[in-house]
Amino acid sequence: MKKINNNKIFVLFLTILLYLLNITTAQKPVSINIKIFDQLPLYNDNFGSQSRAATIKSMVATSLNTTFKTPSLGSATSSLPSPQLFQYWFQSNFANETKNSGLNAPLTRTITLNYDSDSGNYIFNNPNFFLIDTDGFDKTASNRIYKDSTGTYHNYHYCVAFNYVFKPDGQGKEMFKFTGNDDVWVFVNNKLLLDGGGVRSPEATTVDFTKAGLVKSQETPLDFFYCERSTNSPPSFKIETNLGGLYCKAYDYCGVCNGDGGTCCNPQTDCLTQLENGTLINDKCTIPICPPLDTQIDKNLGIGFFCQHSQIPDPYAGSLCEKGECDSLTGIWTRNTSICPTDKDLAPQCRKQATCDPKLGCQSTYLCNNVCDIGTCNNGTCTQKTSNDCVQELDRGVEDKCFTYKCVPNVGCSKTPICPRGTDPCKNYTCSGGICGTVDIPQSECSCPCPGLNKCNTRICNPDNTCTLFNLTEINDGNPCTDDLCDPVTGDITHVMTTRCSGCNTCDVKTGKCVAQDSHCDDGNPCTDNACVASANSTANSQVGQCTQTPTAKCDLGDKCMVYSCTLEGGCNATQRVCPNSGACKIGYCEPGFGCKLKDRVCSSDWYCIEAQCDAKYGCIQFDRRCAPDNSKCQEGVCVNNTAIGKNDGKCISEDYDPKPFVCQKAALVSTAVIASVVVVGAVVLGAAIFAGKKGYDAWKTSQGNVMAASQANPLYTQSSNGGENPLYNSPT
């Protein structure tokens, strides 16, 4: 067996002593899941080989966007080549691969903050914070163009964010310090408390928690944002904090804390197919969308199965006279103006196409508005007025047997005597009950000279042998809406519809007055209200009617919780109003008589130690209740469910760390007894190590049971992580 060097024995003893002391003070490390957004200067020229300068304040707004948990751009933007692209520093953007499109590559990593017993803080320190070399955009070898001073390639351009929460212990000693180069912002309670924007050299900055408005045991968000934008020096990244109780409340389906799904779902590549009737198809007329963040993804089906697809907006929308049609295979839109039915389509309805109004839609002309039409259509044929209709119209339904009734096209109903008038001026031609007759007129009454006598009138001789002329009674057809005419040479009688009423006005055969006929304005569109109104061209002797069409109001029945609509094909429709939500935590509902309102989304948990909240991004979430201890250095908060009383009953308690951390023990207890016991144990271990080597140490450790449960490895036989020499790494022989 080799001789043991005294120096090595001393180092061994010291190592054991320090290690055992560390056992009593060790705390669990804090793991933080970070979001990384790889940036390429081609797509976002705010990143590149920029010169370092002083810290820039007010690059971001002082309040955090509480829905997306991202900072908003502030007032100091002059140093940014493209301020509009700031929105893509900390959220996924799957844009086109074009200059300054804002395209980024979302990634995720986990960093571990180890407990430092000297300071009582948790620390992560990496002076060469190159976490995503050959990842993100740099998976493509041609993008690996940035190198450090030694010529070694690195991925320099990226942003980091994490959104965690903690519960203050009420001691007022919270601390969070960051040391690094380029941009860093930290928000506490959604307030900007660390403002370090700009491409700059590494410097230490500390959060001022006195401005955070902390309340003991109250859930408090801490949101961290960092960017490495230059290649002038390696990215330095160090976090030091005493917030050992940092935790994440919600993870997306990619497993990222407060993620947006971007690390495992790119809609341009993962959502190209959709489910239709049980078959996955690729429809280029839809916009692929990654699943909602609260979706439970079945890994056997793949994320694409849960993607959503919304229709690409019709580029020709806005006019009721045209629409776009999209080819699902090519995604190419074509314009279709064949919206309205053709004359052939309308013929069975006795209509013909008139025009199309972009706001009102298709309009047609009704062909059964002639004066001899009764206004109904029978399979494409207008129903004509019969003689009975004319009796009703002219004589209120009482037929005069001495006349024939008929409707003359473009003239209307008229009646003519059934008994013809003869040429003998000394006979009076009569009709009674439909029977024609004559009555002789004395010569003295019919043979007098009568200048102006023609075939359209008759005469009566006066005692002084003069005559009086009268128009033939049959000239008047009894219709006040016709102009009655008689040819004085031939005696032919004609009746012409009056021109006093025109347009959509018609003449009332009972009164002779012009009446507006709204039915004559029917455009065949159930979604318009049609009216006949007086035209500006009307005069006292000529009443001109003009048709107007307006969007119909007859569909709206006044119920504020119904949505009324109208279609050319179906007319009026009514559907239940769906009130939109406002974000993930405000639920829309409809209150009768009022309309849409919002109410808080209610999230519940059956157990006290499982908290339920509504998150503005995820909706209802559940997570373990974290309890703030009375003294975070010496105690941990523990949640206890009281199942004996009920599921929702429980409490938070503070329990001392066991074993109690060295700094928390009373001086009197820590002095001689503790040190002595440590020395004794150390001596035992030292002896085991010297005389039995590694196996002796391991056997001793096993015999101690739970006493050494906190030990993670044998410190004597673990190679130093920093390259230094472990004096007893090799077993003595």
From Swiss-Prot:
Keywords: Glycoprotein, Membrane, Signal, Transmembrane, Transmembrane helix. Residues 114-260 form the PA14 domain. The chain crosses the membrane at residues 673-693. Glycans are attached at residues 22, 65, 96, 277, 336, 379, 428, 471, 537, 573, 641. It holds the Pfam family PA14. This is Protein psiM. The keyword Transmembrane helix applies. Its main location: membrane. One of its GO terms (biological process) is sexual reproduction.
